[in-house]
Amino acid sequence: MPELSKEAITPHKDEKNPRKKILKLGKLITGDGGFPFSKMTSADAPYWGLAEIVSDEMADVALKMKVRTPYTFSEMVQLTKADDEEKLQKLLDEMSQLGLLEYDYGYHYDHNGRTAPKSERRYILPMFVPGSAELFNMDQKIHEDGSLSNPRLEEHPALGAFFERMTYVPLKGKTQLIPPGGAGLGMHVIPVEKAIEAHNTSMDIEHLSYWLKKYEDSIAVGQCSCRSSMAVLKEGVADDAYNWCIGVGDFANYLVETGKGTPIDYEEAMRILQKAEDNGFVHQITNIDGENKIFGICNCNVNVCYALRSSQLFNTPNMSRSAYTAKVDPIKCVACGKCVEYCPAGAVKLGQKLCTKDGPVQYPKHELPTILGWGEDKYDENYRDSNRINCYDTGTAPCKTACPAHIAVQG
């Protein structure tokens, strides 16, 4: 199973004299249950991740807040009993820039788009994932030549390891309990729009164009925290970490105002989505904020995406399940192999139609956690390689996967 990377060591892990306020803040953000960090120590990722960049002064403010509860500035003044409002505002700005805090402007949207102008800014203490653990990895500096860099990760590479740990340790042993749709915890895969546009019954929320039109007044593109984190840990791919992940609505404003993203329009967002499809990336959204609300669209590479890892590594597809299930009609299938090659989850493989002396070859169905006990023996640590297996051990007719010319000849 994935272990803590040795590529980004933090001096705060296993500190003999841990900072009490940071321990307390780690417990607060983790939640009441605290599993698996109920007895928080300096060895735990919530501690050393926060200790890397969060000051005690910031912790004092955050500890006054409830997780995922919005507060206006006047409410923050009352909450913290601040005598110097200018100093508090500066501190809130710093916490927002780091990603310890998020903020919105009242969320004035319905099915058709914006319903009212932005109202007063509301500060929110997010959970770790999705939330501060990934926002810590997002910092965008634009150089004179137009190139981009991430000064925060360059100075604090351990933040990449922090994000990785917070997408693994808290979920281990839990993912099999997640129902279809992710229950607000996982990411929801949105299929390529061209693949569902002919279906009159498809819901608006299953179309990326719907979400982009809904939030058309506020769209931004920012750095992919998964790609950035993996690159720091030297497990990345050749993808550019910038200009893939799209923020919408108030979150788009937050990205731009805190230096984590760049404003774009609807047309540019659609170009990014098309480019992602051309590269074989997976579109994902999250419904953590409630029904008919999203804050972003991720264009995910299965080799580096932590959300897809959660479903693939733990072998629990509900974590990222789409509302659509692809099915193959054996009679109509000509074994062209396209679905096998394109599916990032390795959901289909090539088999053979030719019968054996005992009749047609029977292929096993994928085991699901809904019907079996689910332990580490069911995990697939080699999911990246497993998903690239194109055919069953029995072989395939046609033998496209082995043919030097890559030609499918139906057998």
Language-model region placement:
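A short, conserved structural fragment
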Residues: D93-H111, V348-K349
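Ferredoxin-like iron-sulfur electron-transfer modules
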Residues: Y123, I285-N292, G296, L313-Y342, ...
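Short helix-coil-helix linker/hinge
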Residues: I53-A59
